[in-house]
C-alpha cells in the first residue's frame, strides 16, 4: 500500500511530533511504501530519510500551521493518508480531498490539544477547528498515544460518542540506543536533566518552574542540564542569573542523537514539568527511562500514564515549583530510592515501550 504521511513539523526541527513521524514511517515501511509530506523549513539538511520526505512550500504559513495546496493533486498517487493532527491549514486540504476520494483510507494520529494561541493563530486556525469533526468522521481510525489524554482533551466529547474509532498506540523508544552506562561511576554532584524545545511553541514545558524549584533545593550538590534551543533561551538564562544560580545551570543547546544519548546516561534524574495539556505524552520520558534514569513529570492526562507514580518516578502538580522541589529532593537525597526507580524505569522501557512491541501495534492498525 502507498501511504502519504502528512505532518506539520519534521527534523531538523526538534519535537515529539516530528520524532514520532520518523518512527511511524520507519515502522510502516516494512510493509508499505511511505512518503512523508511536510512544509519547507529553513536550513533543512539533506539526509538518508530525504528520499522518503517531500518538503512543500506553503502558500501561507504561521507558526506550525501551513497551507499546502499542492497536496490535493499529489495525494492521487496514494492509497492511504496518515495525518498527524493538529496541522492547521493542511488538515482542511485532507478533509476536502476525502470528500472527492472516499475510497482513500484515512488514519489520523491525534497528538495534542492546542492552547495558548495568539489572536492571529486563532483566526487562521478557525477553518480547521470548524471542520475538525467532519474530518474525524472521514477517518477509518484515530490513533493516539494515550486514551487517558483523549478522554480529557478538547475532543473528549467526540471520543465519548465514537469510542470504537480510537486506538491507543504508545510511542516507542530504541532501548539499544538509549541505555544505561555499564559501569557508571557515581558523582557527588547530582545531575538533573531537562530535554525539550526552548521556543515559544514549547512555552508549556514549565522550565521557569523548574528553575524556581532548583533555586529552592535544600542541598547544594546539584547541577541542572537543559538540552534544547529556541527563542526563549535568553529569558531562561536571565531567570537563572536572577535566581543566583547561573553557575549551576548549563544550557547545552541542541544536541545530536549521540550527544543526547550520552547526556541521558549521565543524569541522576529527569524532569518534565509541563504546565498544561499541550503536553500529551512525553517521548523524552521514554528516552530517560530507557537510559535507566528515574523521572518526574506533571500529573497531566496522558503524561501520567507513561510511568507508575512511585515506581519509576514521581508525578507533580502542574505549575507548582514547591511540589517539584519536594519531589526532586525526595529522590536525590535517597540513594536507594533513586537506584530502585532507575532499575524499574529501564525495565518498563523494555517491557512496554521497546520499538518491537509498539511497532506491531501500529502495523496491526493498518492491517485491519
Language-model-derived ranges and their functions:
Residues 105-107, 114-135, 151:
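Nucleotide-sugar donor phosphate/pyrophosphate-binding loop at the beta->alpha transition
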Residues 308-310, 314-322, 330-336:
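Conserved acidic donor-binding segment of nucleotide-sugar-dependent glycosyltransferases
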Residues 294-297:
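Short hydrophobic beta-strand element within catalytic cores of glycosyltransferases
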Residues 71-90, 94, 104-107:
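Short N-terminal targeting/anchoring amphipathic segment
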Residues 254-255, 262-267:
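Short alpha-helical donor nucleotide-sugar binding micro-motif in glycosyltransferases
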